[in-house]
C-alpha cells in the first residue's frame, strides 16, 4: 500500500494509527504500508505568491514512486494545499480536478486500486487573527481566506464524484467537520487543528478511525481521551509507529523530491532490513 499526501501525511501519525488498526483488526489482509507524504505538495500544481518556493507537485515524483513501490493499493489525501488558501474559483477547482484525473489514470495504468481521501477540515477559529475576507488583496498559507473550508467542501465533492470501480472515496472532510461541530457544542474553543491546517493528536486519531472504517474495519467505540493513552501503552503500537516513521524517512528521498532543494538517496536496503526485524517484533508482541 502506497500512501501519498502533503505535510499532514508526512507527519504520519494518522498513518501509524491506521497501520495499527490494520494489523490488529484485519491481520489477514497482510497490509504493508509505505507512506511518503511531502510537505506543501499539491495535485493542482498551484502555488500562492507568498509561498517561499514553488510548491511541489505530486506528478514530479509519482511515476518513480509507482515504479519503485509497485503498490496494489494507493491511498491519496490531497486538497488542503490545492486551493492555495484562496476563495473559491472555477480555475483552481479545475486544476484540482485535472490532478485527480491524472492520478486516477496513472494508478489504474499499473493495475492498482485507488482510495481517495477528502481533505481534513480547515479551522479558521483558532487563527482568526490572521485570516482574511474574500476582499483581501492577497491570500496564502500565512493569511488564508477565512472561509477556506468551504473551498475544501468543493474539493471533497469533486473527489466523491470520482467514485467508481477500483476508486474508493472516503469522505474524511465531512467526518471531521461533523465531529468538530459536535465538540463545539460543549466547548466552543475545541479544535482539531490549532494552526488551522495541521491536525493535533486527536485529529490524527479521528483521521485514522475514519479511514479504517471506510476500508471496512470494525473498530471498538472509544473516545480519544481513552484510546490515546491505551495506544501509547501498547508495545505493538510503539513498534508499528517506529517502523512507519523509519520507512517514511528512508523512502521519501529514495523516490526523490524537490521542495526548495532536490533530495535523492541511492538505496533503502539497510532500512528494509530494520523494517523486517521490527515486523518480526510486532508479530511476537501481537501473539502475546
Predicted ranges, named:
Residues 7-10, 38-44, 73, 79-85, ...:
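Solvent-exposed loop/turn segments at secondary-structure junctions
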Residues 108-113, 167:
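A short helix->loop->beta-strand "cap" motif at the edges of active sites that frequently abuts
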Residues 12-16, 45-49, 86-90, 118-119, ...:
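Short, solvent-exposed loop/turn and secondary-structure capping segments
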Residues 95, 124-172:
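Substrate-gating cap/lid alpha-helix
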Residues 1-40, 44-47, 52-55, 62-70, ...:
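Serine-esterase "nucleophile elbow" of acetyl-processing enzymes
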Residues 51-52, 83-97, 141-151, 198:
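The substrate-binding groove and active-site-proximal loops of carbohydrate-active enzymes
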Residues 165-170, 177-179, 184-288:
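Conserved catalytic region of serine esterases and O-acyltransferases that act on ester linkages
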Residues 5, 15, 19, 59, ...:
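Extracytoplasmic/secreted envelope proteins and their assembly/folding machinery
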